Amino acid sequence: MTRNVKKYRPSKQYLEVEEDPVPQDNEPGKLAQLWAHAVEPASWPWKPVSWIPFAVTSVCFAVLMYLLGTDLMGHNSVLMRFLHRVNLVFHEFGHPAFSYFGRTLGIPGGTLGQLLIPLVVTVAFWRQRDTLGFAVGGFWFFENFLDVAVYMADAKVLMLPLIGGLGSEAHDWRNLFTIWDVLGHTETIAGTTKALGWIGIFSVWAWLGWRWLCSKNN
């Protein structure tokens, strides 16, 4: 007599083993992905600029450049006095903000603050491909170089009034130049900073004119 013997066949669900995905050699890492996302707007087209906004912006730039060259600290100009005080707000904010990271950044924190805010504004307009906004933000950013240059040049003569009537011990750039042992090169450093500011301002205006011509031709 024979017996029917059933052959054992393992279920497929036990045979199938999930394997971890093998990373591709050409797959970008996290930093590369973040960088690609950050610079992605560079491939987008700029918004066109018509002649009226370009003309109005150019007139404003010309007036501001004249005032920057003749009355930077706003002794005779309400507009420049207002602009200087706006910059001063971000300057004073920068001190406690960067002091969180230690005294090394706390001293130049004022200057970093008044440069960082316009830079953030400029980058925001750049990401939106806003031509006029980017130009205005860039102008503001480089205008702060002129403001900083005045503060630098005062490191030796100590003629500028400081907030709260404080003395030379509270002068950011005198302290920094003393720490770096470059107080004797104050004029050179301040002059270079001022030159960079003017070069940046003229470059921004020239770029805006170029973008207007591109919009006009298209």
Across the structure, where does each feature detected by a protein language model lie?
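Low-complexity, intrinsically disordered extramembrane tails and loops of integral membrane proteins
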Residues: 1-43, 218
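Interfacial/capping segments of alpha-helical transmembrane domains
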Residues: 70-86
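Generic hydrophobic alpha-helical membrane-segment signal
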Residues: 79, 83, 98, 132-135
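Low-complexity, intrinsically disordered, cysteine-poor segments enriched in small/polar
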Residues: 30-37, 85, 89-92, 179
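Context-gated lysine
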Residues: 6-7, 12, 30, 47, ...
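Metalloprotease/metallohydrolase-associated module, dominated by Zn2+-dependent proteases
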Residues: 37-75, 104-218
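Active-site recognition of the HExxH zinc-binding catalytic motif
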Residues: 84-99, 110
